[in-house]
Swiss-Prot record:
Lineage summary: Bacteria, Pseudomonadati, Pseudomonadota, Gammaproteobacteria, Alteromonadales
Gene designation per UniProt: aat
Protein name: Leucyl/phenylalanyl-tRNA--protein transferase
UniProt-annotated location(s): Cytoplasm
Species annotation: Shewanella baltica (strain OS223)
Catalytic activity: N-terminal L-lysyl-[protein] + L-leucyl-tRNA(Leu) = N-terminal L-leucyl-L-lysyl-[protein] + tRNA(Leu) + H(+); N-terminal L-arginyl-[protein] + L-leucyl-tRNA(Leu) = N-terminal L-leucyl-L-arginyl-[protein] + tRNA(Leu) + H(+); L-phenylalanyl-tRNA(Phe) + an N-terminal L-alpha-aminoacyl-[protein] = an N-terminal L-phenylalanyl-L-alpha-aminoacyl-[protein] + tRNA(Phe)
Molecular-function GO terms, alphabetical: leucyl-tRNA--protein transferase activity
């Protein structure tokens, strides 16, 4: 039976994602906190937090799940030509806090953000402990785009992206895909499907299939140097 669980501040195991509600799609639990152990447990089990500043903490595992296969993200010919002409520089884990702040800025036609100060503090802690990572796009010394997410074994869980110049976030996505391919990652979790993700080649798969893939990949080791601070040279041929 589908049911909504209420979490307290004592650390406890999450309920099975299969118990998540269908309306709203994927809502599994309410409450708890954003301590690193709980967040890592959530992502390890295919669950993520998503809530507005005036809501309690809400935990989700939607069905279907939006995913990318590294190597299958669509980078159009016109975008490749555009990016080749840009003097942009792309880095990994150079400005995580600034990327989160950029992602937290309200979007057009939105009055607020789900990336609250509480969320930012929690994910900065995950970054400091080597679990959360960022891709930055620079024009000179100005940060013009980027994305961030978590690495769980050979799975990258994308959280959010932003841009201050046209196509800068797409440059970050292209760099992420290139890097993950080189480092042997097998899956990118994009959480909830939308038209933008679909245009980039995201696939909607059943939650049970996502959980199966996650369980196969989450404990696989990756090169310790994967997330050292570095520059990425886009290969756009």
């Amino acid at each position: 039976m589908k049911s909504l669980s209420f979490l307290n501040h004592e650390f406890e195991a999450f309920p099975s994602p299969e118990l998540a509600l269908t309306d709203p799609n994927g809502l599994l639990a309410i409450g708890g906190d954003l301590r690193p152990e709980r967040l890592l447990s959530a992502y390890y089990n295919g669950i993520f937090p998503w809530f507005n500043s005036d809501d309690p903490i809400l935990w989700w595992s939607p069905d279907p799940r939006a995913v990318f296969i590294p190597g299958e993200i669509h980078i159009s010919t016109s975008l490749r030509k555009y990016l080749k002409k840009q003097p942009w520089r792309i880095t990994i884990n150079h400005a995580f806090t600034d990327v989160m702040a950029g992602c937290a800025q309200p979007r057009e036609k939105q009055s607020g953000t789900w990336i609250t100060q509480e969320i930012q503090m929690a994910y900065r802690e995950l970054h400091y402990t080597g679990h959360a990572h960022s891709i930055e796009v620079w024009e000179g010394e100005r940060l013009i785009g980027g994305l961030y997410g978590l690495a769980i074994g050979q799975v990258f869980c994308g959280e959010s992206m932003f841009h201050r110049k046209t196509n800068a976030s797409k440059a970050a996505v292209a760099a992420l895909q290139q890097h993950l391919l080189k480092m042997g990652f097998k899956l990118i979790d994009a959480q909830v499907m939308n038209s933008h993700l679909e245009s980039l080649g995201a696939k909607a798969i059943k939650r049970i299939d996502f959980i199966t893939l996650l369980s196969e990949l989450r404990n696989n080791p990756v090169d310790p140097a994967t997330w050292t601070t570095k520059e990425v040279i886009l290969e756009l041929e």
